[in-house]
Amino acid sequence: MYQPDFPTVPFRLGLYPVVDSVAWIERLLEAGVRTIQLRIKDKRDEEVEADVIAAIALGRCYDARLFINDYWRLAIKHNAYGVHLGQEDLETTDLKAIQAAGLRLGVSTHDDMEIDIALAAKPSYIALGHVFPTQTKQMPSAPQGLAQLARHIERLADYPTVAIGGISLERAPAVLATGVGSIAVVSAITQAADWRAATAQLLAIAGVGDE
């Protein structure tokens, strides 16, 4: 059985929005979300440090699981709950420093080979994507679909997992039915006509996660 080397997270992280601003972090924590990621791309550390500090403070205020995407040095410096890394970041990141700081680690994967690479790092959770076509970011691979997602879940057994990529309110129940621990969403909330209603409906489906 695979086991994380990094600090553990609940198998069910619940609804897991991925957003690009502190304003969204605050809105969603106020709305009841308890697992969330700040993903700001392609800026220097000094440009995003204030946002990272503010996001981490909000996470603490709401006793939430706040992951910082990519900016691992800032996450360590300001003691975030966790860090999320893409495959391309694994080789250039000091994983031992993240581990020594006591931060949780999530890693993105897109196929079996990348799952193997992620498992070698023994992160706190493994993200599996993209499940469906997505407009949120350019993807180098084809969508996995539900059947492939289910196969990955079967392989990983009790390892905490997060499904991501094109997951809408309508698709969320079928994604969770694969046995995946959590669902990450982006546009299902941020581009919804009524983000509060969308968040409430997704929370009703996915929950807030286990303690």
Swiss-Prot record:
InterPro entries listed in its UniProt record: Aldolase_TIM (IPR013785), ThiamineP_synth_sf (IPR036206), ThiamineP_synth_TenI (IPR022998), TMP_synthase (IPR034291)
Cofactor remark: Binds 1 Mg(2+) ion per subunit.
Keywords: Magnesium, Metal-binding, Thiamine biosynthesis, Transferase
NCBIfam families named in the record: PRK03512.1 (NF002904), thiE (TIGR00693)
E.C. number: 2.5.1.3
Taxonomic classification: Bacteria, Pseudomonadati, Pseudomonadota, Gammaproteobacteria, Enterobacterales
Keyword Plastid (UniProt): no
Reaction(s) the record says it catalyses: 2-[(2R,5Z)-2-carboxy-4-methylthiazol-5(2H)-ylidene]ethyl phosphate + 4-amino-2-methyl-5-(diphosphooxymethyl)pyrimidine + 2 H(+) = thiamine phosphate + CO2 + diphosphate; 2-(2-carboxy-4-methylthiazol-5-yl)ethyl phosphate + 4-amino-2-methyl-5-(diphosphooxymethyl)pyrimidine + 2 H(+) = thiamine phosphate + CO2 + diphosphate; 4-methyl-5-(2-phosphooxyethyl)-thiazole + 4-amino-2-methyl-5-(diphosphooxymethyl)pyrimidine + H(+) = thiamine phosphate + diphosphate
Binding residues annotated for 2-[(2R,5Z)-2-carboxy-4-methylthiazol-5(2H)-ylidene]ethyl phosphate, in chain numbering: T134, Q135, T136, G166, V186, S187
Residues binding 4-amino-2-methyl-5-(diphosphooxymethyl)pyrimidine: Q37, L38, R39, I40, K41, N69, S108, K137
One MF term in the entry's GO annotations: magnesium ion binding
Keyword Nucleotide-binding included in the entry's annotation: no
UniProt GO BP: thiamine biosynthetic process; thiamine diphosphate biosynthetic process
Protein residues bound to Mg(2+): D70, D89
UniProt record similarity statement: Belongs to the thiamine-phosphate synthase family.
Function: Condenses 4-methyl-5-(beta-hydroxyethyl)thiazole monophosphate (THZ-P) and 2-methyl-4-amino-5-hydroxymethyl pyrimidine pyrophosphate (HMP-PP) to form thiamine monophosphate (TMP).
Cofactor(s), names only, from the UniProt record: Mg(2+)
Alphabetical list of Pfam families matching this protein: TMP-TENI
Pathway: Cofactor biosynthesis; thiamine diphosphate biosynthesis; thiamine phosphate from 4-amino-2-methyl-5-diphosphomethylpyrimidine and 4-methyl-5-(2-phosphoethyl)-thiazole: step 1/1
Recorded name of the encoding gene: thiE
Protein name: Thiamine-phosphate synthase
A GO cellular-component term linked to this record: cytoplasm
